[in-house]
Amino acid sequence: MAKKKLENLSFEESLNELDTIVQSLEQGELSLEESMTLFERGLNLSQLSQVKLQAAEQKVQILLDKNGTAKLTDFDSSAGES
């Protein structure tokens, strides 16, 4: 699989590539240099996935029913925290 630029990867593509990298590293058949290159790519993919997940979380809308009227409200990630 040709490596796409990180910014062009979807969330699912980044997770799939990250999974492939983990499997390759766990096999232990790579040189140190190859392992370090994959490890660095994996870290970047992990960070990208986290950013994309946070962006999606911010866009989530919750359907609230107030006084019998449906209303869309932006997701508030701090609403359940004490």
Swiss-Prot record:
Keywords: Cytoplasm, Exonuclease, Hydrolase, Nuclease. It is found in: Cytoplasm. Its main location: cytoplasm. One of its GO terms (molecular function) is exodeoxyribonuclease VII activity. Pfam families: Exonuc_VII_S. Heterooligomer composed of large and small subunits. This is Exodeoxyribonuclease 7 small subunit.
